[in-house]
């Protein structure tokens, strides 16, 4: 893969506006596609200070300043109330939304389940899900499929198989649509986000999303209660994530998680977990279709039934996946709220200030990444990784609240990519308009129509 080739091809991204947007233009940009709202200076400055009708905010782009918020003084920067307001009705108070002692108890109890040894035990189940998708593609060779939808279906099937041993009764399409509907509706900026309206006033988005929320929360609750009853009765049960979570104990106290916490975390894993990995796979497959040199390298490494050792040898595939996560981070924004006054470097922060860390902006920052908008997987070669500042690359967050499922997601993505590349090559459909689109996660705005071709035929 030559530098000349890479520098003549800029993967699609919105062009930042020049200068600050006025209040109405900013609201429209945030509502239409949030990544279009950041002006060009955001990709060059260490921080941006701003205000809206709900108060002040600071966008951080300097790795040292980000470290201060996520590590050094993390206790002063919990997740902001607006984020919790949107997520809690769906995922309850699991790891994604819990705070303080509740979060610490959950984290130390759940984290051991996602250590490499635990994740490795799921690889065979993951491979079955990928094989079933590829068998369907065998019957559709030459056809055009929406790869974004295919990856969402795949990662949902993997979560269903590894978490619930495929015992979910609600049809996959119904569950998947419910999850997408909920997070899509609440990920859209509305007047409640920019005006000081009473918090008790019902949000139309919440009302629209409630039926979808009920579908997946009720289904998970049924499965959890059924499994808990079987365990209590001494029956043999699958060794999946439901069973492991019910049996997990706090390493400090020996106490189990409460039923409500187990339920909320299961909803979190199936709701938030599968969509982020689906987006990572979608964007990586798109980049492979655009950069055939990269596609050839992934195919050269590909293996049909990868185990943990085989995945560890996928050096080029991992580099390409990590570069895809840089260009198209599945979660484009994260935010915190200052509990009390603080200094972040030279920036004085008042209590209540919203701190925004935007991987979409950070990963394309001109001072941190040479050729920031270009696809250059060699950035992540073993000999180059040490040059990347630790807090310049945050596809899974960082600090105490780094994504607990990071290892699971990376192994899942590597396994899917190598199995797909061994058997198929994907080509973007003629005339397809590909543009990233941000709600809570980053997806292609119009899906990703691609033609499925058997690898041996090309």
What are these regions (language model features)?
Residues 2-105, 120, 124-135, 154, ...:
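N-terminal membrane-proximal hinge/A-helix region immediately C-terminal to the signal-anchor transmembrane segment
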Residues 276-295, 299-301, 407-422:
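Cytochrome P450 catalytic-core helices
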